[in-house]
């Protein structure tokens, strides 16, 4: 028995969950300690009204564990028992990623359980899932993509069965009727009753933190193409954590999703995207791809060898620009 579903953030604001086919919907609620998805409550209430299984997630910034957990729980509010609670652990805009993955996540999960009696689920990419083998009584939601080709729901996602997880996210390029754009597609390994077991509390008296002050409104959004803004973000012009959220305003989700895509996508797929022009050339490409640059560029060069006879007046920079590479 399995369920098909989607996960959404403000990037899909306004999506009509009454017409998009899905058994469950996981909705981004919060990030850090100062961001609430502006479409969170609308999407949640609509999904609830049309009978979807529900999940709510917090995107970690890797700051103070208790503060981030309390902020999330305050915005979960009276939805406890209705929705699965989830921690989203990714590299983008996360100060603790790579340095204390297990310790941070385990502490956050334990704290949320102590306050709610609900065992949250942990989302992470397959490449770091081994770090959470002994995470305790918390399910894993693992992201691993075969490629970036458009796809509908899959009965048997690539690499299924190679590891155990509660939920598998297998594409960020899902295409479903009722929505004109890409969606994250997921498979839950269980029934609706099993989903409900993840959401239910095993405590009788639960007190969640009070609702925090309404977050300050986002600043005016910076202008520019997504590649230009990602480049500036990687250079540090918009800061990290709460500063990045504030400075990017309504462009934040768009930019952060682009950066996160680079972290989780395979080298082969990134190389294909380089050839399509998605990451620009020269210093822009090198900066945007970050630590993935060398492996991706090697793949591009290996599969796209070209030869050029130097002419009088040529420069290395000019040749590199012409062929979309570096020197």
Enumerate the language-model features and the residues they cover:
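Substrate-binding cleft of extracellular glycoside hydrolase catalytic domains
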Residues: 1-118
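Glycine-rich, charge-decorated loop segments at or immediately adjacent to ligand/cofactor-binding or catalytic sites
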Residues: 67, 127-137
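Aromatic-lined carbohydrate-recognition surfaces of secreted/lumenal glycan-active proteins
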Residues: 117-130, 142
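Primarily N-terminal secretory
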Residues: 211-222, 260-268, 287-308
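Residues within the helices of the helix-turn-helix
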Residues: 246, 287, 317
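Primarily a LysM-type cell-wall glycan-binding module
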Residues: 223-238, 266-279, 303-326
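LysM (lysin motif) carbohydrate-binding repeats in extracellular/periplasmic proteins that recognize
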Residues: 250-254, 281, 291-298, 312-327
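Functionally critical loop-and-helix segments that line ligand-binding/catalytic clefts
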Residues: 1-19, 135-220
